[in-house]
A protein has these predicted regions:
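Hydrophobic alpha-helical packing segments in soluble, helical-rich domains
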Residues: 7-9, 24-35
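Inter-domain helical "communication" segments and dimerization helices
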Residues: 1-19, 36-37, 109-114
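Sequence-specific DNA-binding recognition helix
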Residues: 69-105
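Short alpha-helical "recognition helix" segments of helix-turn-helix
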Residues: 27-28, 38, 77-78
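Short, leucine-enriched amphipathic alpha-helices that occur as contiguous helical runs
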Residues: 1-9, 55-63, 86
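Terminal helix-turn-helix DNA-binding modules in bacterial transcription factors
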Residues: 44-80, 107-114
Length: 114
């Protein structure tokens, strides 16, 4: 279990979650754990699916970027965060935060310049 935990910690520290190619198989290979154990670990220890966990990490990064760079393009941000499309990004952002990225900017007082 400690090998997997160490691999997950490294995955977060290096922001590998932003790279769409760094998926669950990448972590399984790096940690050397069995895929069934990986699934068990996320279900029972993390109490969420890997994809949900990774999307949450990406959304937290999105919030940091939006607050620091209010004029950021949502399309560019979606690609930078590994969401692929702005629609996918908006869907996950609203699901996690309860607001669209634009609403989040307005709430935080980081209005986009007109």
């Amino acid at each position: 279990m400690s090998r997997l935990k160490a691999s997950l910690d490294e995955y977060v520290a290096l922001k590998d979650y932003l790279n769409p190619e760094r998926d669950r198989n990448y972590i399984i290979e790096r940690s050397g754990v069995d895929p069934r154990f990986f699934r068990w670990y996320f279900q029972n220890v993390m109490v969420q699916d890997f994809r949900v966990w990774r999307a949450n990490l990406r959304i937290e990064e999105a919030k940091r970027i939006i607050m620091a760079t209010p004029d950021v393009s949502m399309n560019a941000l979606a690609m930078r965060l590994g969401f692929g499309t702005s629609q996918n990004f908006y869907h996950h952002f609203k699901k996690v935060v309860g607001q669209t990225p634009t609403e989040f900017m307005e709430t935080c007082g980081t209005n986009r310049p007109e």
